From Swiss-Prot:
InterPro entries linked to this entry: Metalthion_15p (IPR000347)
Family membership noted in the UniProt record: Belongs to the metallothionein superfamily. Type 15 family.
Disulfide pattern: none
Keywords carried by this UniProt record: Metal-binding, Metal-thiolate cluster
Keyword Magnesium listed: no
Pfam family, one: Metallothio_2
Biological role: Metallothioneins have a high content of cysteine residues that bind various heavy metals.
Protein name: Metallothionein-like protein type 2 LSC210
Organism of this sequence: Brassica napus
GO terms for MF: metal ion binding
Keyword Cell cycle (UniProt): no
Length: 28
């Protein structure tokens, strides 16, 4: 579950997915 929280934090910080503002986008 800890990995899940880290992923969420990383994703939220990078806003990756449908709205990727990171360039290059390092979010998985």
């Amino acid at each position: 579950e800890a990995s899940g929280e880290t992923f969420v934090a990383e994703n939220d910080a990078c806003k990756c997915g449908s709205d990727c503002k990171c360039n290059p986008c390092t979010c998985k």
